[in-house]
Design a protein with these regions (language model features):
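N-terminal ligand-binding lobe of clamshell/alpha-beta domains
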Residues: 1-242
């Protein structure tokens, strides 16, 4: 909504809203991600409540029972992220501005694809979304890794809609032997030393060559504009650094 110039429509946000920085100064925080006060949210008298993912299903149900209008997105791919931008643009009568944004992102993605097409070899990349249990191959990240010039070693799992479908074992990573390990643990810092010290991981190329990197969750784990801009830029710099 900020990118569309429609931020004046926002009456409340979650405490996990981090972009843009001024959002927390401009709008009241009325919920967490999973939990929220139906009373506080309803008191804002919103015309529409927008949420993301099946994880918010219980909160959405409570709000619906309180006679609120609720729209939950569950975008998982780059194409779906772009469609969400268009949908929100239509809702707030800013479709033209939304289309311009989408066009910019698509042009940037296409430029990246053309640039990396010149690479002779694509490094094998392992992305870790969470450590215990270990999850990988969240779809939009898997796609962005490919766009940035890498080869996601678990891309075959990326179409799994549920986290349990993307769970992996540490031995699987050893077998894949990635050249680069990227990690972004939502809600806590990545412990790179613990990754290095996992049984058998000392033989992985990424560990031997010290190519383990943490990525800020706010630019990679949120399937929105940030992942298509800052997230893609960071991925490209880390994957193509050599």
């Amino acid at each position: 909504l900020y990118l569309l110039g429609e931020q004046h429509r926002i009456v409340g946000i979650t405490r996990y809203t981090v972009r843009p920085k001024e959002a927390k100064e401009n709008h009241p925080i009325v919920s967490a991600f999973v939990d929220g006060s139906v009373k506080k949210i309803s008191a804002l008298n919103p015309d529409l409540i927008i949420g993301f993912s099946d994880i918010q299903a219980d909160l959405a149900a409570k709000l619906i029972r309180a006679n609120q209008q609720v729209l939950i997105f569950n975008q998982r791919s780059v194409a779906e992220i772009l469609e969400v931008i268009m949908t929100i643009g239509r809702i707030v009568s800013a479709e033209e501005r939304a289309q311009k944004l989408v066009d910019q992102y698509q042009q940037s993605i296409e430029s990246s694809i053309q640039r990396v097409s010149l690479l002779k070899d694509k490094p094998k990349v392992y992305f870790e979304e969470w450590d215990k249990p270990t999850f990988s191959a969240i779809r939009w990240v898997s796609e962005l890794i490919e766009i940035a010039g890498g080869e996601d070693v678990f891309s075959h799992k990326s179409h799994g809609k549920l986290a349990k479908e993307r769970e992996i074992q540490w031995d699987d990573v050893i077998d894949m032997n990635p050249d680069i390990i990227l990690a972004s643990w939502c809600g806590k810092p990545v412990d790179i030393e613990s990754i290095k010290n996992r049984p058998g991981w000392s033989e992985i190329n990424a560990v031997k060559n010290d190519r383990i990197h943490e990525i800020d969750p706010s630019i990679i784990l949120q399937p929105g504009p940030a992942s298509l801009t800052d997230g893609l830029e960071v991925l490209t710099s880390l994957i193509c650094s050599d």
